[in-house]
Amino acid sequence: MSRYRGAVVRIIRRLGELPGLTRKTTRRNSRPGQHGDQPRKPSEYAIRLEEKQKLRFNYGLTEKQLLRYVKDAKRIKGSTGEALLQLLEMRLDNIVFRLGMAPTIPAARQLVNHGHICVNAKRVSIPSYQCQTTDVISVRNNARSKQLVENYLSFPGLANIPSHLEIDKEKLVGKVNGIIERDWVALQLNELLIVEYYSRKG
């Protein structure tokens, strides 16, 4: 399944606020579609599927990518759900977003793809690059790159930078000081239901 490129508003009407995907919000409580206003009790499968979709759309992942992250999280000692979130939060496109260098993860992904971002002084153009503690995230030393990020920093997607990150806005340099704590994950979801979803699929 490829990455979603359709109408963002339909997604947030169905799944709720997705801060990584878009700044847009919707006041309508009903789901999209002809029968969106008809109340119905979702099945347990539907609830687990919805939580999985929240995660996939927020971080801009394909189904194949998310499945790989779930498998990687299961190999990590401790809570699989929390490990999954930590892996996703350490993606370079997400780190750029959480530092305020881009208003959304898709915008951050574009910065990375176009070569505007460096990790430890080396240009990295892979959005899924897995950042490590002590990594230094900087902006490529040219006028175009700096102008883009300076504009984004004036209107960050999220108000607060997580405690495991820091940024020098004048130098356009950020640093990863550790692993994100669960409370700092901006997306509202139950990650245990996602682990259950994949466990039941076998």
From Swiss-Prot:
A GO CC term assigned to this protein in UniProt: chloroplast
Family statement: Belongs to the universal ribosomal protein uS4 family.
Role summary: One of the primary rRNA binding proteins, it binds directly to 16S rRNA where it nucleates assembly of the body of the 30S subunit. With S5 and S12 plays an important role in translational accuracy.
Superkingdom assignment: Eukaryota
Subunit (UniProt): Part of the 30S ribosomal subunit. Contacts protein S5. The interaction surface between S4 and S5 is involved in control of translational fidelity.
Name of the molecule in the record: Small ribosomal subunit protein uS4c
Keyword rRNA-binding tagged: yes
Domain called S4 RNA-binding: residue spans: 90-152
Region: Disordered, residue numbers: 20-43
Keyword Ion transport: no
Cell location: Plastid, Chloroplast
Pfam families per UniProt: Ribosomal_S4 (PF00163), S4 (PF01479)
Gene3D superfamilies: Ribosomal Protein S4 Delta 41, Chain A, domain 1 (1.10.1050.10), RNA-binding S4 domain (3.10.290.10)
InterPro entries, alphabetized: Ribosomal_uS4, Ribosomal_uS4_bac-type, Ribosomal_uS4_CS, Ribosomal_uS4_N, S4_RNA-bd, S4_RNA-bd_sf
Intrachain S-S bonds: none
GO molecular function: rRNA binding; structural constituent of ribosome
Coiled coil feature spans: none
Keyword entries, A-Z: Chloroplast, Plastid, Ribonucleoprotein, Ribosomal protein, RNA-binding, rRNA-binding
GO biological process: ribosomal small subunit biogenesis; translation
First-listed, main subcellular location of the protein, grouped into a coarse class: plastid
